[in-house]
Amino acid sequence: GWDRPAYQWMNAGIKTVGNLEYSFPGVRYLEHDGTSRHWPTGYPDYRLNRYEENNHGHYKSYHVTGEYTDFWGGYWHDDGFGFGHTAEYADKPGKKIWIWGLSPYGMIWEKLLTDSDGQYSEVQSGRLLNQSIGTSYRTPFKHGALSPYVTNAWSERWFPVRGTDGILYATDELAFNIVPGNGQQTLKIYAIAPVSGELLVTSDGNK
């Protein structure tokens, strides 16, 4: 036919210094060949969504899946600052983390690819669930296709988050986190767009 492979990912480089936590909702991650593994806890007990706990093996490539969410992001706990990304899941289901690796194998790229700000990581949004490779034709995870005279259009947004001690969920209007401690849970909210009127919070039917 006339269809041609279509492949689109948006890539942002972010710093890794500052106790970085990746807020990527999901229960599994895909490798490039379609292999599925546990997320966010890896073998044996690594918290893969914490940059500093990826200090094993070589580079990491996590295509996180398993939850139909329209957001993901990251948070530097030492800085009290983070970022979020939103898009309709049907438009951008792919969300990927790339880590060069914390061993000398990976950290050599800090010298080769950066200036003086330290190592970086990549966070990416994609039109597909993973970045497939040649053997992916044997899996459900393949390149998409685009027909002649067809146009694809979508919207995605990036925004800052501050003072929430992490990100549990985000929309185009606000981001929030629930922080446990001292026998209670604290709701922390960061407005992304102007918010007016009453904000009603419910839990198990209680206001």
Which functions belong to the PLM regions below?
Residues 184-206:
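Beta-strand-rich binding/interaction modules
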Residues 160-173:
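Proline/serine/threonine-rich low-complexity linkers at boundaries of modular beta-sandwich domains
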Residues 2-8, 168, 197-201:
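Short, hydrophobic/aromatic beta-strand segments
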Residues 131, 162-163, 196:
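A short local loop/turn or secondary-structure capping micro-motif enriched for an aromatic residue
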